[in-house]
């Protein structure tokens, strides 16, 4: 039997200056729809991001946040940048990161990141099972 699993898909842009990240964030926040923000972030990532993920629109992939499987007590890092992954996991846990909203800039050893959760699957944030895709 398959158990409950909470996963998010994350995209990001990383730049070397906080001021640039703030300008990019302002540009993203001008877009009214979450779907439009995702598309804009993908274009901006391809043009400005320092991360190799820019070739795929800043896609960092899926991160599993929770499971009702008692055998899973800890999660191995999914991202190469463990520092960034910790920020993402904490932001989702604290409800400061939400699907479709731009989060950041967040500074790591790689630079300044803007983070966007583009999809959420199996959210435990409500009573209903969600598989929302933007």
Sequence positions of predicted segments:
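Glycine-rich loop/hinge motif
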Residues: 13
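Acidic/polar surface patches and capping/hinge elements
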Residues: 1-9
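Peptidyl-prolyl cis-trans isomerase
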Residues: 16-133
